């Protein structure tokens, strides 16, 4: 028996090395893996056709409800002033003080947008990745619960799972050039002013801090200088960091403006934000840059995330607002985001679990945090 176990282990190890690490076997394996994923995405409309959350709202406010779910891009926590960074990248959010809840221990489930965002829009955990192609996403959940749903994207359609899930919203709008995130707020304002009756969910998919960083903000928003477009070399590190930090500072302006607008409305409202993944920025001797590498880093995993609740929300649903504040330092992954926004809206449904919501007193801090690797396995 021990010899059988040893042989099986050695065989599996050899198979893993051949498949994942030896050229050209790994190339062939990855081509097959990508082809299989492509087929699953293409078949999504069919495989998810009969899916229902059986959602219902357990409580409603005494005025209309507006919830904003903001998905950031490539925004690592290490460069946010709110997380202890020594540059003023969050002056406006910092000025809000205790009005915002900063989730300080949030890790992404994937360091690539095309994997991370679908999971942020879904109830699926990393260890059940194939369920992504059977279940509907957040727009469908809120539709069932009686909300009018809007998906506003500052990124181009790619024909991938993000677009499949986004199309379940009642309305889907892709922004045009220039792709500055403030246009998401401008569009949201027009919608809110035109629709004064419905409870609303807005999903705002930002361009955030996507490379090239200097293109993510208008020139008048350039605070850290010089921020020239330069070759990715260590000698230009400060200019690269200046541009990246300017993009974070522009996100600060954008989020604080969304919060300010929500606060001005006669509505029960809340905002939940998280970046999809972080970024490497030539941080150490490895000189790693960007994200999506097969072996990840703390800078790619640790993302910025926060919540805000209106005074009306805190009056009507004090338990959820207080629970979120109590979990500022709780260990979490972006899996909690779907669960948290559903809980904030007081939605009960299949695949909605209070113990996975940061806005629930019963949030479970003991759950092992997993990451989806480049072979779609939870590690």
What do the predicted segments below correspond to?
Residues 7-69, 74-231, 302, 333-335, ...:
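Active-site-proximal alpha/beta segments of enzymes that process anionic O-linked groups
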Residues 220-237, 288, 312-321:
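Flexible internal linker/loop segments at domain or repeat junctions
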């Amino acid at each position: 028996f021990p010899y059988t176990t040893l042989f099986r282990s050695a065989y599996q190890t050899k198979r893993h090395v051949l498949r994942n690490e030896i050229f050209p076997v790994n190339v062939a394996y990855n081509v097959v893996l990508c082809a299989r994923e492509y087929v699953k995405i293409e078949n999504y409309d069919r495989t998810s056709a009969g899916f229902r959350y059986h959602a219902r709202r357990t409580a409603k406010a005494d005025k209309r409800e507006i919830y904003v779910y903001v998905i950031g891009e490539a925004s690592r926590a290490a460069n946010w002033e709110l997380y202890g960074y020594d540059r003023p990248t969050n002056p406006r959010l910092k000025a809000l003080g205790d009005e915002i809840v900063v989730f300080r221990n949030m890790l992404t489930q994937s360091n690539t947008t095309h994997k991370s965002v679908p999971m942020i829009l879904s109830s699926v955990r990393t260890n059940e990745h194939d369920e992504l192609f059977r279940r509907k996403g957040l727009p469908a959940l809120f539709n069932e619960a009686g909300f009018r749903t809007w998906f506003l994207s500052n990124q181009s359609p790619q024909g991938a799972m993000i677009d499949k899930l986004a199309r379940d919203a009642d309305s889907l709008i892709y922004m045009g050039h220039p792709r500055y995130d403030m246009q998401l707020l401008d569009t949201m304002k027009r919608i809110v002013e035109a629709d004064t009756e419905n409870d609303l969910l807005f999903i705002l998919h930002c361009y955030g801090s996507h490379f090239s960083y200097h293109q993510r903000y208008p020139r008048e928003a350039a605070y850290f200088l010089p921020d020239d477009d330069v070759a990715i070399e260590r000698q230009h590190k400060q200019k690269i960091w200046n541009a990246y930090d300017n993009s974070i500072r522009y996100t600060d302006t954008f989020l604080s403006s969304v919060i300010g607008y929500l606060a001005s409305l006669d509505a029960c409202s809340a905002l939940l934000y998280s970046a999809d993944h972080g970024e490497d920025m030539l941080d150490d001797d490895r000189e790693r840059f960007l994200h999506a590498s097969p072996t990840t880093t703390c800078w790619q995993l640790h993302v910025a995330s926060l919540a805000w609740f209106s005074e009306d929300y805190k009056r009507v649903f004090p338990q959820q607002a207080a629970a979120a504040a109590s979990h500022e330092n709780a260990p979490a992954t972006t899996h909690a985001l779907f669960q948290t926004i559903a809980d904030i809206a007081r939605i009960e449904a299949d695949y909605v679990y209070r113990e996975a919501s940061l806005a629930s007193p019963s949030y479970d801090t003991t759950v092992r945090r997993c990451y989806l690797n480049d072979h779609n396995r939870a590690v």
